[in-house]
């Protein structure tokens, strides 16, 4: 989950786990139904990630909490526990507060190796302690000032049913004891009518040039309230030392109004633009009439190309399905598309993915692969839906998939639920233990059948995936009407049971899909099925004759350019 902007050698060493995550943010007036949305692809090779559940609890005075690094399990220290903590499902809590992240790395000397709070722990501790996005910003920044921030530079998506923010944070190096100098951070409120995104590259630039209305951290929950008489302006909140620290280190010498957070602390290089900002570009491109002016920036070739804005006003209202589609994106129909004529990088079956590492060398030259939003190494993917007009037990719907978003159906998990479906719990499985009852492993089993023979197998997966997505959409309204007729614990039990049932149904469906794929596509051939996906039998009761599709025409054309007449069939004279 890391993008380390260091020297080239360190960059290559980190490439397998770098350039890892993607987040999208949709304001309530930008969405089709008034929801606030946050999405998150958690991309990390080798990571096994279940759906997390932290039950609500009350804690004794003096109780301490052990902190272990989210990425590695390394013990970092202890912090004081809060008197009361909230129920957390995945990256959302019972108040519909949602937090996502992407790592941008930044200047390596800013990492605080003596800190106790890493970025993952910061997310889940905050979800247990905060109820709104603004409270979350206060909790997160106070925790790292008190205990130190152990991780590299992060961009956080922080949202509740009423508003969304983007927070960027970095440490100030090790052995800092004066709390006001332990981190540098800035938080920007995303306008209600806008969409935003981040993908492992710091995105906040100038914020003291008059475009934003500053608000002090202590006043964040009191001033410019949501739902007040006046519209909420474009707010910014930042640490007192955010500019001073850059001046002290010699990284900035201009006027405060000229200060850019990412220019000072995490300036985008080629990899930050082509691998990271290009994903943001692809998301924005879906909701803009013409976003081609920013192609040179996203491509990373032109050093002085105009950078993209932090957020845009979409040209249409954004729906849940729009976000599913965006999470499954491979740059289709864009200059970065992976399915262009002549590109055989996806193999015989035109896989819209490229093998890692992202760069490789040949004959003394270095080359690179595109890095799309949808990628092999996604451990889980979610779309968090937050709705202010519904009771909070119902309003928070956490659409969850335990693999690459392109290869899963997003299954509804309500944020009030008090237990998990077994398939998402991690029970009986880990990163090196396969289980037929575990969604991570069953979904990865299916996707890893599909990847190498994408154009052949993916249509079968897509049919099942889309059918499940559509069934969940059809059931959502009637399920929530039934939930509104209930109260208190009965409502929570109903939505818990519903969520667990959908999880159980999903994994059963995916197991059946796995069985179907191995039979239908065995030996790189295709067994015919009827419209109900049932295998056909001949008059003797055996499966009907298989079909051998051969190689796609586009691949044949490129192959023959390489092989010439080597495999040209000789013309034999007829006798």
Predicted features, each with a name:
Residues 21-119, 139-310, 317-318:
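A contiguous strand-loop segment
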Residues 344-485:
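Substrate-recognition/cap regions that form aromatic- and gly/pro-loop-enriched pockets
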């Amino acid at each position: 989950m890391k993008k380390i902007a260091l020297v080239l050698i360190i960059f290559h060493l980190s490439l397998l786990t770098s350039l890892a995550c993607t987040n999208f943010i949709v304001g309530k007036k930008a969405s089709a139904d008034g929801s606030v949305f946050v999405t998150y692809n958690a991309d990390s090779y080798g990571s096994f990630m279940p759906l997390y559940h932290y039950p609500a609890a009350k804690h004794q005075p003096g109780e301490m909490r052990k902190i272990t690094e989210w990425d590695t399990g390394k013990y970092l220290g202890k912090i004081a526990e809060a008197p009361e903590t909230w129920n957390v499902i995945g990256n959302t809590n019972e108040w519909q507060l949602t937090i996502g992240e992407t790592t941008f790395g930044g200047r390596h000397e800013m990492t605080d190796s003596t800190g106790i709070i890493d970025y993952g722990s910061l997310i889940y501790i905050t979800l247990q302690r905060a109820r709104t996005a603004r409270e979350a910003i206060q909790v997160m920044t106070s925790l790292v000032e008190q205990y130190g921030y152990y991780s590299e530079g992060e961009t956080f998506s922080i949202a509740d049913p009423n508003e969304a923010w983007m927070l960027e944070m970095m440490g100030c190096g090790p052995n800092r004891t004066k709390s006001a100098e332990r981190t540098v951070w800035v938080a920007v409120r995303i306008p209600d009518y806008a969409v935003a995104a981040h993908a492992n590259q710091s995105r906040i630039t100038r914020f003291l040039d008059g475009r934003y209305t500053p608000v002090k951290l202590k006043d964040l929950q009191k001033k410019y309230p949501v739902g007040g008489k006046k519209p909420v302006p474009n707010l910014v909140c930042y640490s007192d030392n955010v500019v001073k620290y850059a001046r002290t280190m010699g990284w900035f010498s201009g006027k405060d109004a000229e200060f850019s957070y990412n220019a000072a602390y995490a300036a985008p290089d080629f990899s930050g633009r082509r691998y990271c900002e290009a994903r943001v570009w692809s998301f924005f491109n879906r909701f803009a009439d013409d976003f081609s002016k920013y192609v040179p920036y996203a491509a990373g070739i032109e050093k002085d190309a105009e950078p993209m804005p932090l957020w845009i006003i979409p040209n249409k209202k954004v729906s849940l399905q729009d976000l599913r589609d965006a999470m499954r994106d491979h740059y289709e129909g864009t200059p970065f598309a992976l399915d262009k004529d002549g590109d055989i990088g996806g193999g015989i079956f035109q896989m819209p993915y490229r093998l890692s590492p992202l760069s490789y060398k040949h004959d003394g030259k270095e080359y690179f692969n595109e890095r799309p939003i949808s990628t092999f190494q996604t451990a889980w993917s979610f779309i968090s839906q937050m709705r202010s007009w519904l009771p909070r037990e119902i309003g928070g719907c956490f659409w969850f998939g335990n693999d690459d978003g392109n290869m899963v159906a997003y299954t509804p998990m309500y944020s009030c639920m008090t237990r998990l479906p077994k398939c998402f719990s991690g029970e009986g499985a880990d990163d090196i233990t396969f289980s037929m009852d575990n969604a991570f492993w069953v979904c990865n089993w299916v996707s890893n059948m599909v990847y190498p023979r994408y154009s052949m197998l993916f249509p079968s997966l897509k049919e099942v995936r889309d059918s499940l997505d559509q069934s969940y959409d059809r059931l959502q309204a009637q399920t929530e009407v039934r939930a509104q007729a209930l109260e208190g614990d009965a409502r929570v039990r109903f939505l818990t049971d519903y969520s667990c049932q959908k999880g159980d149904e999903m994994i059963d469906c995916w197991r059946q899909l796995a069985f179907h794929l191995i039979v239908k596509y065995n030996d790189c051939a295709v067994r015919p099925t009827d419209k109900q996906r049932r295998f056909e039998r001949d008059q003797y009761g055996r499966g009907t004759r298989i079909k051998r599709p051969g190689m796609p025409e586009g691949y044949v054309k490129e192959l023959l350019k390489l092989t010439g007449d080597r495999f040209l069939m000789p013309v034999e004279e007829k006798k």
